[in-house]
């Protein structure tokens, strides 16, 4: 390296935790469903340089599972909440979103349908503009990518 040459600093790769219902993404064998909305969103984020963490394994149990989720939420720059009829009745999604709110994580709600939020965390999400993905896939992806670029520090 010659004198005076400035090396680029390694850029922090943005990391998001995906809070979702497995029923929206995985089949009964825990394999991703082809062409699922969740898969499309995950691929779009990854394709734009975002490190994505979502639980697709059913190998965790009880207390250990809670610790894995909590550690990954805390390690993320933001939480992308994939709101759907199924995720809004999920006990685990409720815990993830409530934990994220309690720990002041940036939350980006993405509405896969027009289901109202679970009352366990609806108040914590009030005032946060949701990406209304169900109104149009391309516009939804673009808004999510714009939101993640602006909100994730």
Task: Locate the predicted segments by residue.
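Short low-complexity, flexible loop/linker segments enriched in glycine and/or proline
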Residues: 67-71, 96-97, 123-126
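Glycine-rich, charge-decorated loop segments at or immediately adjacent to ligand/cofactor-binding or catalytic sites
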Residues: 115-128
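Generic anion/oxyanion-binding catalytic loop in active/binding sites
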Residues: 27, 89, 133
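Conserved TIR/SEFIR loop-to-helix hotspot centered on a Trp-containing motif
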Residues: 61, 85-105, 117-119
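Conserved N-terminal substructure of TIR/SEFIR domains
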Residues: 1-81, 101-106, 112-115, 139-153
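Short amphipathic alpha-helical segments
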Residues: 14-16, 126-129
């Amino acid at each position: 390296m010659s004198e005076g040459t400035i090396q680029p600093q390694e850029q922090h790769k943005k990391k998001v935790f995906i809070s979702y219902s497995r029923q929206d993404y995985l089949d009964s064998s825990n394999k991703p469903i082809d062409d699922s909305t969740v898969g499309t969103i995950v691929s779009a984020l990854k394709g734009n340089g975002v490190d994505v963490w979502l639980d697709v394994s059913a190998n965790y149990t009880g207390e250990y599972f809670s610790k894995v989720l909590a550690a990954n939420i805390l390690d993320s720059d933001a939480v992308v909440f994939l709101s759907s009829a199924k995720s809004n009745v999920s006990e685990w999604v409720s815990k993830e979103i409530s934990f994220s709110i309690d720990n002041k994580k940036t939350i980006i709600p993405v509405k896969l349908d027009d289901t109202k939020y679970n009352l366990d965390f609806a108040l914590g999400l009030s005032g946060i503009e949701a990406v209304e993905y169900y109104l149009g896939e391309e516009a939804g992806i673009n808004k999510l990518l714009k939101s993640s670029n602006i909100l994730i520090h």
